[in-house]
Amino acid sequence: MSNARDVIKRPVITERSTEVMGDKKYTFEVDVRANKTQIKDAIEEIFDVKVAKVNTMNYKGKPKRFGRYTGFTARRKKAIVTLTPDSKELDFFEGV
């Protein structure tokens, strides 16, 4: 993952994630192969902020059936990024 935009897939906008935005915590869906250091570097490069810590969660795919064929949905990884107190707010989430 040479590019920072390959690490960060999309923001996660849920009721809980919007509540913790006041504490400078932002939630993103990230590549499943990315580690915390790569996620931190990608956020700092894209948004030009300082990251205090990164918490990650791995989700397994859910079993799904289509007729007699069974399979799984894609697995995913979610990261909650906490910014330092002196960092600016991410304007990406304004109006949410």
From Swiss-Prot:
Alphabetized GO MF terms: rRNA binding; structural constituent of ribosome
Alphabetized Pfam families for the sequence: Ribosomal_L23
Cystine pairs: none
Keyword annotations of the record: Ribonucleoprotein, Ribosomal protein, RNA-binding, rRNA-binding
Record InterPro entries: Nucleotide-bd_a/b_plait_sf, Ribosomal_uL23-like, Ribosomal_uL23/eL15/eS24_sf, Ribosomal_uL23_CS
Oxidoreductase keyword on record: no
GO cellular component, one term: ribonucleoprotein complex
One BP term from GO: translation
SUPFAM superfamilies: Ribosomal proteins S24e, L23 and L15e (SSF54189)
Coiled-coil stretches: none
Self-association and partners: Part of the 50S ribosomal subunit. Contacts protein L29, and trigger factor when it is bound to the ribosome.
HAMAP family with a match to the protein in the record: Ribosomal_uL23_B (MF_01369_B)
Function: One of the early assembly proteins it binds 23S rRNA. One of the proteins that surrounds the polypeptide exit tunnel on the outside of the ribosome. Forms the main docking site for trigger factor binding to the ribosome.
Family: Belongs to the universal ribosomal protein uL23 family.
Name this protein carries in UniProt: Large ribosomal subunit protein uL23
Gene encoding the protein: rplW
